Amino acid sequence: MSSEDSLKSLSLDYLNLLINGQAFSDVAFSVEGRLVHAHRCVLAARSLFFRKLFCGLDPNHQPPPPPPPPLNWPTAGGGGGGSGGGGRGGAGGGGGAPATPELVIPVSSIRYEVLVLVLQFLYSGQASVAAPKSGPLPGCGARGCWHTRCGAAVDLALDTLAAARSFGVEQLALLVQKQLESMVKEASVDDVMKVLMASRKFEMQELWATCSHLVARSGLSADLLAKHLPIDVVAKIEEIRAKSPLAAAAAPRSPFLTHHYLPMNPASSAADRDNKIRRMRRALDAADIELVKLMVMGEGLDLDDALAVHYAVQHCNRDVVKALLELGAADVNSRAGPTGKTALHLAAEMVSPDMVSVLLDHHADPNSRTLDGVTPLDVLRSLTSEFLFKGAVPGLTHIEPNKLRLCLELVQSAVMVTTRDDGAPVTGGEAGGSDGGNFPRSDADDSLVSLTMNSTLMYQGQEMAAAVAAGEGRKSNNGRGSPPPAMYFPNGFA
């Protein structure tokens, strides 16, 4: 066996001691409700931090007494038989050393995965800083992610780097630095900036140089960088840009068209697009509009191609949609799906007054039509008709009638305003004149007021029907059904 093989075997033996060392451990670390068993002699020999820690424990803590001699072990006094009997009694009949209480040290400054990585390196001299591929990693919700450049993998590496510096394990810190240098080349801009600040804190010049050049090439403006980085760091990045041959090419570009001058790999463009969309959706779910802005300006994310507004309307709250639209990088009237629905169509189908109002406030077109010619008003009119004739919408029992009425009024008002602004007369009997504007009055437009009256009667009728149904429920069932809903709508669609 060569010396290299011997060292590998020794490293593996020590690693197995850590993995299966509960029976022989004399110290345990309590982290995140889990115990990690270890051995003070190994940790003290490998790390000055642990040596000082174990030497500076509570003075009331006394080291465990030496174990009694094993069975039949020759002693200076000779009496082998007597010691043997005492050995059995002291060991409880097991013939071994009496168990000593294990020292438990609570740990709150680092997480479980980081502590395990540090201990693995201390025991074996080797550690894989990269997260397990395709396995679960806290902080990463993407299915099938290989954790080579995701934010969770970067955070794990940064936490391991900080722990290595705290424990005085410089070799592990260098190993993590090399890992980060390869990760940042494919990581997002916000992750690169996190690594940049960590390299500055720990004075890692090579990692600093790599990250600073990547941020300089990102195309983010100095004003935006100043919101996330110290002023002196922004100044150094601007100096790098001034010396870079890409500065002249990047200067006249729009902030929303960055990275277009960088080489693209067609083979990975589809995977990159899907990864960007997943990260954008996670940012929207977390209401992190700044991260979305960084992705737009630093990575060239197309919000319309990613259907950002549609996703936000369906899965986020009003404030997120409002902030997203105020970025100015998304078209509120962009279409999605095989029928070409706009975000306003989705808001109408959801019967969400909050979404309808915020979209209309940001100039959503109430007259936009799908490929089938359906407008948002048509969607609401159809839902209203279902309520008028059936009293409820099949599959949409969660819809509140008051919200439906409010959505209807909002869209109707927007249609009227749009029609008036486009030049269609709306006063007196001239509403149907032959010289109408771009949106001539039709039978649908003429029925807006009638539809409002009918919808108002609908809600009043539903309240009356509910009261009658409650009264009938208290009576005995005599076979007479409740009156049909149409009796409450004398001016309905009959």
From Swiss-Prot:
UniProt KW keywords: ANK repeat, Cytoplasm, Metal-binding, Nucleus, Repeat, Ubl conjugation pathway, Zinc, Zinc-finger
Biased segments, Pro residues type: 61-72
Gene Ontology BP terms: induced systemic resistance, jasmonic acid mediated signaling pathway; plant organ development; regulation of DNA-templated transcription
One Pfam family per UniProt: Ank_2
Keyword Zinc recorded: yes
Cross-referenced InterPro entries: Ankyrin_rpt (IPR002110), Ankyrin_rpt-contain_sf (IPR036770), BTB/POZ_dom (IPR000210), NPR5/6 (IPR044284), NPR_central_dom (IPR024228), SKP1/BTB/POZ_sf (IPR011333)
Repeat (ANK) residue spans along the chain: 275-303, 304-334, 339-368, 372-406
Coiled coil: none
Region of interest called Disordered, as start-end residue ranges on this chain: 60-95, 421-443, 471-494
Zinc finger (C2HC NPR-type) boundaries: 137-151
Entry keyword Endoplasmic reticulum: no
Membership in a protein family: Belongs to the plant 'ANKYRIN-BTB/POZ' family. 'NOOT-BOP-COCH-like' (NBCL) subfamily.
Domains: entry comment: The BTB/POZ domain mediates the interaction with some component of ubiquitin ligase complexes.
Protein name stated in the entry: BTB/POZ domain and ankyrin repeat-containing protein NH5.2
